[in-house]
From Swiss-Prot:
Molecular function (Gene Ontology), one example: calcium-dependent phospholipase A2 activity
Subunit-structure text: Monomer.
GO biological process: arachidonate secretion; lipid catabolic process; negative regulation of T cell proliferation; phospholipid metabolic process; venom-mediated suppression of platelet aggregation
Source organism per UniProt: Trimeresurus gracilis
Known role: Snake venom phospholipase A2 (PLA2) that inhibits the ADP-(IC(50)=272 nM) and collagen-induced (IC(50)=518 nM) human platelet aggregation in platelet rich plasma. Exhibits very high hydrolytic activities toward the synthetic lecithin, and prefers the anionic micelles (dPPC with deoxycholate) to the zwitterionic micelles (dPPC with Triton X-100). PLA2 catalyzes the calcium-dependent hydrolysis of the 2-acyl groups in 3-sn-phosphoglycerides.
Pfam families, per database record: Phospholip_A2_1 (PF00068)
CDD domains: PLA2c (cd00125)
InterPro entries in the record: PLipase_A2, PLipase_A2_Asp_AS, PLipase_A2_dom, PLipase_A2_dom_sf, PLipase_A2_His_AS
Protein name (database record): Acidic phospholipase A2 Tgc-E6
């Protein structure tokens, strides 16, 4: 029941590049970002603290860092453009913020795909925040 509530809340807040991020994850990792990565480990989902728990959680940590480096941008709302060329995602457009956000999302989706074998829902799905108290490493 708690999972359904979280999914409903997340869907209400999805706009702009968050929906595009979901589409990139589905395209590259062949899984739903909102379902599989919205409440995983210490960094996948809203916020993030502590140390990444595994390679999948590290994808989210690096993604958070990437968004943090996109100064002057609004990564969760900046709508970007991308295309597919020879099976690769190519971020486009003239706006540097939107292109940077696209590159962050693309890198995370590729990271999820490349680390599918580390995804451990029994241990890290709905991981309690109290287990994420270690000092975080720098971006």
């Amino acid at each position: 029941m708690r999972t359904l509530w979280i999914m409903a809340v997340l869907l209400l807040g999805v706009e702009g590049s968050l929906m595009q991020f979901e589409m990139l994850i589905m395209k590259l990792a062949k899984s739903s970002g909102m379902f599989w990565y919205s409440a995983y480990g210490c960094y996948c989902g809203w916020g993030g603290q502590g140390r990444p728990q595994d390679a999948t959680d590290r994808c989210c940590f690096v993604h958070d860092c990437c968004y943090g480096k996109a100064t002057g941008c609004d990564p969760k709302k900046d709508v970007y453009t991308y295309s597919e060329e020879n099976g690769d995602i190519v971020c486009g457009g003239d706006d540097p913020c939107r292109k940077e956000v696209c590159e962050c999302d693309k890198a995370a989706a590729i990271c999820f795909r490349d680390n599918m074998d580390t995804y451990n829902s029994k241990t890290y799905w709905m991981f309690p925040a109290k287990n994420c108290q270690e000092e975080s490493e720098p971006c």
